[in-house]
From Swiss-Prot:
Keywords: Cytoplasm, Exonuclease, Hydrolase, Nuclease. GO terms for molecular function: exodeoxyribonuclease VII activity; nucleic acid binding. This is Exodeoxyribonuclease 7 large subunit. Transmembrane segments: none annotated. The gene is xseA. Its main location: cytoplasm. It comes from Shewanella sp. (strain ANA-3). The keyword Nuclease applies. Belongs to the XseA family. Its EC number is 3.1.11.6. GO terms for biological process: DNA catabolic process. The keyword Cytoplasm applies.
Length: 448
């Protein structure tokens, strides 16, 4: 066997070239697997093995990376990781250097996130040359968020502290759950239809990847991109990143940071105003000097012309302008006076005193009608009672007695209308028109 003289590798050289090949060709990869042999030494680094049913690979996640992981990994847990293939040269072991780690459930969402991110980037929605500049002097901010969440309280607190002069218009929307993305799109479209603010602040507090998923909507990305108003995305905490952050004109890490970005400190604003006033005074001074020079030149030219004639023309023009100004002022004052009278009439009509007078008259009218109706009802009732009394009197037994008849009852006060009801010796009572008569039956005659 012939040994080559110039192509003999050392172990270190071989491991180094293998490392360069793996890192250069594979780059970053996503890997799904089960954690085993997890260890977290005092250095702060994590070491673990990812495995499936057939294979396994050693992994390392250094302290600077694992501090952003929101959970503590445990053996047997399914995770989705992103990292770079490398070779640990001292042992010749190839391994995965993990950059980010998510639970397997969040991992599926992360894959969808990356796929949508690549798609929208290819469409140019993240291009830097499409980003709009924020207005320099923001007077009114439109906040798109939940009106009851912590984010709006943070935003209002920061604005009140830094620049109370900024007005805030809240476009209430759902910021979590089903159809939240379409709800946010509708709020952005409403703001663009009204065009009543200088800039939009899309914001909510922190949460899990699933909680913030509505901000990773393709429809929302296109709505933000097509917005005529500049959009600042301030969603979640500093470690959270959403599609809305990439497509918005500016990204702020938190709601409070978004409010600070869109406001100026009161002291800085006063200093800036003083600078503007100073520049304005300088401009006015320069303008005055310029006009004085121009006036001097005109005076010199005027001396070469007929001063009296020129003056007469100026006086005539001045008179015309004065008349036009007086007419305009008169018309304006007349219009204002008429408008004032109209407003006074409308105010009088809307005055509580006027309404009270109308209601008082109406109440008096209703009271009169009620009293008349009660009197009519009382009169009708009296007439019916009188008629009924007359009818009762007509059929009353007492009325029969007044015509000369009598009523006879036995000892039990039973009315006797047949002689067969009595026997000789019975006691009977006869009621006349005036008084009663008690009798004893001595004879009974049957006249039937």
């Amino acid at each position: 066997m012939q040994v080559p003289k110039n192509n003999i590798y050392t172990v270190s050289r071989l491991n180094g070239e293998v490392r360069q090949i793996l890192e250069g060709q594979l780059g970053k990869v996503w890997l799904n697997g089960e954690i085993s042999n997890f260890s977290a030494p005092s250095s702060g680094h994590w070491y673990l093995t990812l495995k499936d049913h057939y294979s396994q690979i050693r992994c390392a996640m250094f302290k600077g990376r694992n501090q952003s992981v929101s959970f503590k990994p445990v053996n047997g847990q399914q995770v989705l990781v992103k990292g770079a293939i490398s070779v640990y040269e001292p042992r010749g072991d190839y391994q995965l250097l993990i950059e980010s780690m998510l639970p397997a459930g969040d991992g599926l969402l992360a894959q969808q996130f990356e796929a949508l991110k690549m798609k929208l980037a290819a469409q140019g929605l993240f291009a830097a040359d499409t980003k709009r500049q924020l207005p320099k002097n923001i007077q009114r901010i439109g906040v798109i968020t939940s009106p009851t969440g912590a984010a709006i309280r943070d935003v209002l607190h920061v604005l009140a502290r830094r620049d109370p002069s900024i007005e805030v218009i809240i476009y209430p929307t759902q910021v979590q759950g089903e159809n939240a993305d379409m709800n946010i799109c509708q709020a952005i479209n409403i703001a663009n239809q009204r065009l009543e603010v200088d800039v939009l602040l899309l914001t909510r507090g922190g949460g899990s990847l699933e909680d913030l998923w509505c901000f990773n909507s393709e429809a929302l990305a296109h709505t933000i991109y097509n917005s005529a108003l500049p959009v600042v995305s301030a969603v979640g905490h500093e470690v959270d990143t959403t599609i809305s952050d990439y497509v918005a004109d500016v990204r702020a890490p938190t709601p409070s940071a978004g409010a600070e970005l869109l406001s100026q400190d009161s002291d800085n604003k006063s200093q800036r105003l003083a600078t503007v006033l100073s520049r304005l005074k300088q401009s006015a001074s320069h303008y005055q000097l310029k006009q004085e020079k121009r006036l001097s030149l005109l005076e010199h030219r005027l001396q070469r012309l007929d001063p009296k004639r020129t003056l007469q023309q100026f006086e005539q023009r001045f008179d015309e302008m004065q008349l036009r100004l007086e007419a305009a002022l008169s018309n304006k004052l007349h219009g204002l006076s008429r408008r004032q009278q109209q407003l006074a009439n409308r105010l009088e009509q809307q005055s509580p005193k006027h309404k009270l007078a109308l209601e008082t008259n109406r109440l008096s009218y209703l009271a009169t009608r009620l009293q008349d109706a009660m009197q009519d009802t009382l009169n009708q009732s009296e007439q019916r009672i009188t008629y009924a009394a007359h009818q009762l009197e007509t059929v009353s037994p007492l009325a029969t007695l007044s015509r000369g008849y009598s009523i006879t009852t036995d000892a039990n006060n039973q009315v006797i209308d047949n002689a067969a009801q009595l026997s000789v010796g019975d006691k009977i009572n006869t009621r006349l028109r005036h008084g009663q008569v008690q009798s004893t039956v001595t004879q009974i005659t049957d006249e039937s």
